[in-house]
């Protein structure tokens, strides 16, 4: 079901859709590289999760990056268990459209992924990204430990200063533990590989994101 006007405030536990106990069916293998979306992942590899607007274009930005082993799109940082795409788009689940990134830290650092994240979209737009408006398009970095959070906060501070110098407003990116990651439907996985001419609303600010020496290798 779609609502004619999307709310721009997050739902409460009382107003959120109830969801379902079972996971939504999705693809088993990555459409581009045939690696397993849900694992097992190689020993020593790490995961990162980002939200930067419509996940179709966001996922492609990461799977094209050297050192990234597999990507998947899904929903997180919300309230409704096992939501569908239609439910997320209603604004009544509280989720973002996120990208799970599995990467080799010997090839690319977490800080470099955060840099790519910031440069790939406009993180100052609140509950929208370009023409895409709604709570599911908000910017987010979903960290799994204190070290990731510290790196994300440090890179955010550096980029916020760079953006301010170019006339942009404050960064609205949330940096939190996003809770469960619910894999999106098969149709959405690697969408722009399956549909090369498909919609991609991803667009950055044109401002380079600096990384301090202290966090560059993390």
From Swiss-Prot:
Name the Enzyme Commission number(s) assigned to this protein.
1.8.4.11
At the top level, the lineage of the source is: Bacteria
Enzyme class name: oxidoreductase
Reaction catalysed by this chain?
L-methionyl-[protein] + [thioredoxin]-disulfide + H2O = L-methionyl-(S)-S-oxide-[protein] + [thioredoxin]-dithiol; [thioredoxin]-disulfide + L-methionine + H2O = L-methionine (S)-S-oxide + [thioredoxin]-dithiol
Q: Which InterPro entries match?
A: Met_Sox_Rdtase_MsrA_dom (IPR002569), Met_Sox_Rdtase_MsrA_sf (IPR036509), MsrA_MetSO_reductase (IPR050162)
What Gene Ontology biological process does one annotation of this record name? Answer: cellular response to oxidative stress
Q: Does the keyword DNA-binding apply?
A: no
Q: Which UniProt keywords apply?
A: Oxidoreductase
Q: Which family does it belong to?
A: Belongs to the MsrA Met sulfoxide reductase family.
Concerning HAMAP family, the annotation shows: MsrA
Task: Give the protein's biological function.
Answer: Has an important function as a repair enzyme for proteins that have been inactivated by oxidation. Catalyzes the reversible oxidation-reduction of methionine sulfoxide in proteins to methionine.
The record's PANTHER family line, in alphabetical order, gives:
MITOCHONDRIAL PEPTIDE METHIONINE SULFOXIDE REDUCTASE
Protein known as:
Peptide methionine sulfoxide reductase MsrA
What is the species listed in this Swiss-Prot or TrEMBL entry? Azorhizobium caulinodans (strain ATCC 43989 / DSM 5975 / JCM 20966 / LMG 6465 / NBRC 14845 / NCIMB 13405 / ORS 571)
